[in-house]
Amino acid sequence: MNVSKDLLRMLDSPLTLEQVQPLPDGNVGLAVLGFPIGHSLSPQLHNAALEELTSRDPNYKNWSYGKVELAASDLGKALPLFWECGYKGLNLTIPHKVEVLPLLSSIDEDADLMGAVNTLVWKEDGWHGCNTDGYGLEAGLKESLSVALENAQVLIVGAGGAARAAAAQCLRSKCQKLWITNRSPGRLLQVVEVLAQAFGSDRIQSFPLHDLPHDVLEVKELVVINATALGLKPEDPCPIELGKFRTDCRVYDMVYNPPLTQLLTRASHFQMSHANGLSMLVHQAARALELWTDQRISVAAMYRGVKS
């Protein structure tokens, strides 16, 4: 393994933008950008999948994936720099999924529908935006909680890029009812308006986080999804109080590190089925890596990479 590949793996600490340097000829870089980003497990699972892919096709032996801590204010100058340095694909997490939209040359149908981007693919005219979060969420819910979105009743907490993708995927997959709430009423209203334009308003209901409507509390087998960043820090409060809901709720926290958040601790207390977002992370990552390589990607290898 050469030095540049060691650097790109960055399994313990992320690079800053100032530390991003041109890669040696023949090397291809991939990375996740976010702020904060230290918690991200993406390098472990992507590099494990790339290692498995290289065993089938040696052309990928010089591909590596890292993580870069990037403030929102630096996104505009960062995107051309990554291409110049030899990066052909990027993932985006908080706070970049919506803010990146005006910086892209094009976006795919899913990203347009969801109003958010989590995957960038370099094309001749610049960065092309895609969204694999919706796919990852649906696959993760099925794998971790045996939840099918069709005919499900779903409550999403959040109004950022991840919440937009989750809400659009639920509606597109024919959920029966979608409730959505957020701390910021302005952002909540904006998301609901976009969703209503795309899917109609019949299945969508929003409400203030502090004022849970009675009807949602009575739903059987409600699926509760945390699409906020609350849970990344040990001191973070629970994004929504579960005590008033039925105990047959299924609770899914998109946060995966730490693996047991305040929300999931509360779900366990009330004996609710629950899971963290690792399964979503893995499935969205596999889809992204397929976009970059045009190859079949091993989900099993990604899980092995995280566990190692």
What is each model feature region?
Residues 151, 250, 254-308:
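Adenosine-phosphate binding glycine-rich loop
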Residues 172-177, 270-273:
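Conserved S-adenosyl-L-methionine
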Residues 34-36, 129-134, 141, 145, ...:
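Glycine-rich adenosine-cofactor-binding loop
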Residues 202-274:
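Rossmann-like adenosine-cofactor binding region
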Residues 1-23, 137:
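Short N-terminal or domain-adjacent regulatory/targeting segments
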Residues 22-146:
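Phosphate/diphosphate ligand-binding glycine-rich loop within oxidoreductases
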Residues 175-199:
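NAD(P)-binding Rossmann-fold cofactor-contacting core
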